[in-house]
């Protein structure tokens, strides 16, 4: 089967088909070269070759690498917040050696610990693509002036510059060897506004409720401030440890994007440090081109975002989820089940109430991991009744895990204390002494912490495939795909079926417009355990990883 899907031009953020609730995010970032060239006259760019110093970055050991005195001046300029980096695994022996190594191994499955280490990333690498390696130095920025100093230093000394907040980039853009890192982790202030008007937009835009968030804040901090304590909603990511700035710059899907749209579309204003070292405000009225570009143009592509202001919305009465799994006894029964699920989704779930995913496994099992908003538990159960009645009436199927709906008052969705009391085990605490009590991770996301990616394929599925005459073709393609690898349909990562206002807002971003016509994003992915250089224990089996990646390639080919 060929050409029935629209493929994305960049691997999208956050979610896998490996029983992950919502893998956070990935932004396709490019160097700051366009900014470096912005001051060169256009005629000169066209007529003369670029100077060699603009064509390459200086590395340690080369004559132009900054001297100790140069680094000392930068350290002074940033108030002492310049760090020389080394991986905590650098001192590990065949089993373990040294306090730093032991501490890193102790917290290997804790993404909050990993995010607090400037030398580590949330992903340890991708076979035949990249391996996590720390920058040479990092500026632990606490304010915009620190970022300006780092950008100027990198430009003047022709260093590669890397930006890291949450450190979730799948493409390895959260780190780079021999580079200078702008580490925004400590720029995590959050302020709520009852009536925000973007700078220069008075009389053009009506004041509206909003939240201003520092570039280093995680979404769990934003949700705690806006929802748990503030009683409102901000569109962000599903994975709680993902950084706010990176997600917005890469488009930004969350569990409820089918109703609230993309995170980037909710951006009202940003402070950005451009490659010439200027801190500027970007919004619809001031630097509108830059404002448009950072809404989905890729994290760190056009400058270093230091602060964002996002609109907030009213909460629905309820958030909730539906989970379970159905197994077919034969290939033929599985093909029929896939077709039934597609028809059921089109008739009952293809609307702004429903998000997250349904997975089709190579073991002839359909796995449901959906969320909903604006419905009661009874209404959610009623919506699923037609499919469950059909399954129960046929001996070819087994409800391996009963499909059940659960709802809770929306304000409790990210309330860690509520879950500790009423649903222990659904969230995992940051277990370090003194850690903030609101720092929790969804238990279903823990498998991604430090993961070593073997393969990650994706394709947006156009809504035209849900038409009655096209559903059989889609079912055939999904079945063929599942013979090679499991595939997850992430409905919240396609905006077809979203409210018209959210479609219009998404259209005014730099995100690939194919998302507007897609009812879901198909994701085919696989990984292995953490594989940071220097870690004790077995090394990744690269031959096996490549075999798995090839199988994923065959699976996505069945969809295309």
In which residue ranges do the predicted regions lie?
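Soluble FAD-dependent oxygen oxidases
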Residues: 14, 19-33, 37-560
């Amino acid at each position: 089967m060929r050409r029935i899907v629209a493929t994305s031009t960049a691997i999208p953020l956050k979610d896998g088909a490996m029983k992950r609730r919502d893998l956070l995010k990935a932004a396709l970032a490019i160097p700051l070269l366009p900014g470096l060239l912005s001051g060169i006259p256009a005629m000169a760019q066209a007529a003369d070759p670029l100077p060699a110093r603009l064509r390459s970055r200086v590395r340690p050991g080369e004559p132009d690498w900054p001297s100790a005195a140069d680094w000392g001046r930068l350290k002074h300029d940033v108030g002492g917040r310049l760090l020389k980096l080394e991986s905590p695994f650098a001192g590990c022996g065949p089993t373990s050696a040294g306090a730093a190594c032991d501490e890193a191994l102790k917290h290997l499955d804790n993404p909050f610990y990993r995010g607090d280490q400037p030398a580590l990333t949330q992903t340890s690498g991708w076979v035949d693509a990249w391996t996590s390696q720390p920058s040479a130095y990092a500026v632990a920025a606490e304010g915009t002036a620190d970022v300006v100093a780092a950008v100027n230093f990198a430009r003047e000394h022709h260093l590669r510059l890397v930006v890291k907040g949450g450190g979730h980039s799948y493409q390895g853009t959260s780190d780079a060897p021999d580079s200078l890192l702008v580490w925004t982790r400590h720029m995590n202030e959050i302020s709520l506004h009852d009536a925000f008007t973007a700078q220069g937009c008075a009389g053009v835009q009506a004041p509206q409720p909003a939240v201003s968030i520092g570039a280093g804040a995680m979404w769990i901090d934003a949700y705690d401030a806006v929802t748990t304590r503030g009683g409102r909603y901000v569109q962000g990511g599903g994975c709680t440890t993902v950084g706010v700035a990176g997600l917005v710059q890469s488009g930004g899907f969350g569990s409820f994007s089918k109703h609230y749209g993309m995170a980037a579309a909710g951006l009202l204003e940003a402070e950005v440090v451009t490659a010439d070292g200027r801190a500027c405000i970007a919004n619809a009225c001031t630097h509108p081109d830059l404002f448009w570009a950072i809404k989905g143009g890729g994290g760190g592509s056009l400058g270093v975002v230091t602060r964002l202001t996002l609109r907030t919305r009213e909460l629905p009465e309820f958030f909730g989820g539906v989970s379970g799994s159905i197994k077919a006894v034969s290939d033929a029964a599985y093909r029929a089940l896939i077709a039934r699920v597609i028809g059921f989704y089109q008739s009952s779930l293809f609307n702004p109430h429903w998000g997250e995913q349904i997975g089709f496994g190579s073991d002839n099992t359909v796995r449901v991991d959906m969320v909903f908003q604006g419905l009661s538990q009874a209404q959610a159960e009623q919506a699923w009744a037609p499919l469950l009645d059909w399954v129960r009436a046929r001996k070819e199927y087994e409800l391996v895990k009963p499909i059940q709906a659960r709802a809770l008052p929306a304000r409790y969705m990210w309330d860690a204390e509520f879950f500790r009391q009423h649903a222990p085990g659904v969230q995992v605490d940051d277990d370090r002494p003194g850690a903030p009590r609101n720092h929790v991770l969804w238990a279903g996301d823990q498998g991604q912490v430090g993961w070593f990616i073997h393969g990650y394929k994706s394709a947006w599925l156009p809504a035209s495939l849900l038409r009655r005459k096209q559903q059989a073709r889609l079912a055939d393609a999904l079945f063929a795909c599942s013979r090679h690898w499991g595939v997850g349909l992430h409905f919240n990562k396609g905006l077809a079926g979203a409210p018209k206002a959210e479609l219009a807002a998404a259209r005014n971003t730099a995100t690939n417009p194919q998302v507007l016509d897609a009812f879901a994003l198909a994701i085919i992915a696989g990984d292995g355990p953490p594989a940071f250089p220097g870690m004790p224990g077995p090394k990744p089996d690269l031959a096996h990883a490549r075999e798995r990646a090839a199988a994923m390639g065959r699976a996505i080919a069945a969809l295309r």
